[in-house]
Amino acid sequence: MDDSLGSAETTPRELVHFVTQQTRFALINNILQHPKQLPSMYEPEELNPRVSEATVYKHIQKLIDAVIVKEVALDDGQRRQGYPWKFYRLSEDGREFLEEHNLLAAEETLQQIYDTISDKPEKMVKYENAPRPDDI
């Protein structure tokens, strides 16, 4: 296991248990489902209506702290009013860890399911199509 993942005392088994906690694993799946694998905070909040916004934020932050997820932001000059400017993706180490532990097997299926969601709120579609750091 890469020493940068989790903490120095975290074993791979403990990290698998950590990422497969129901809410955190749903959030990882939301990242994988996103067309650019780079959702804003709003999109996972919308896709998990039974989970409070505060809980989504808390678990995203835990995934960031464990180096599974990385927060990326648009530069000040690239930001647009009314659009998100912070986004979340799997870190390189996080993706590698998930692949090593066979936790990305459904990635393509998740993207296909996401593509079939027909009743996305207007705001979600707007945010989904917002400029991302890789677009600019």
Segment roles from a protein language model:
Residues D2-N29:
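Short alpha-helical segments that sit at the start of domains
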Residues V16-T23, L74-E100:
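Short, cationic-aromatic polyanion-contact patches
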Residues I31-P35:
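Short helix-to-turn junction characteristic of helix-turn-helix DNA-binding domains
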Residues K36-L47:
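Short acidic, hydrophobic short linear motifs in intrinsically disordered regions
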Residues V51-Y57:
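Short coil turns linking two alpha-helices in DNA-binding domains
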Residues Y57-I64, R79:
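Short, hydrophobic-biased segments on the C-terminal half of alpha helices
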Residues I64-D76:
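A short, conserved structural fragment
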Residues D93-I136:
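Amphipathic alpha-helical dimerization/coiled-coil segments
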